[in-house]
Amino acid sequence: SSANPQITRKRHKINSFVGLM
């Protein structure tokens, strides 16, 4: 269940990058 939060963090970073574009 440690991979779940890790994926969310990665997704959040990608979302932030897309929002900046």
Curated annotation (Swiss-Prot):
Alphabetical GO biological process terms: chemical synaptic transmission; neuropeptide signaling pathway; regulation of heart rate; regulation of smooth muscle contraction
Domain of life: Eukaryota
One Gene Ontology term, aspect cellular component: extracellular region
Keywords: Amidation, Neuropeptide, Neurotransmitter, Secreted
Record localization: Secreted
Major location category of this protein: secreted
Residues bearing PTM Methionine amide: 21
Disordered: region residues: 1-21
Function as written in the Swiss-Prot or TrEMBL entry: Tachykinins are active peptides which excite neurons, evoke behavioral responses, and contract (directly or indirectly) many smooth muscles. Is a potent vasoconstrictor and secretagogue that plays a regulatory role in the central control of ventilation, in particular, the heart rate variability (HRV).
Family membership noted in the UniProt record: Belongs to the tachykinin family.
Name this polypeptide is given: Neuropeptide gamma
Organism: Oncorhynchus mykiss (Rainbow trout)
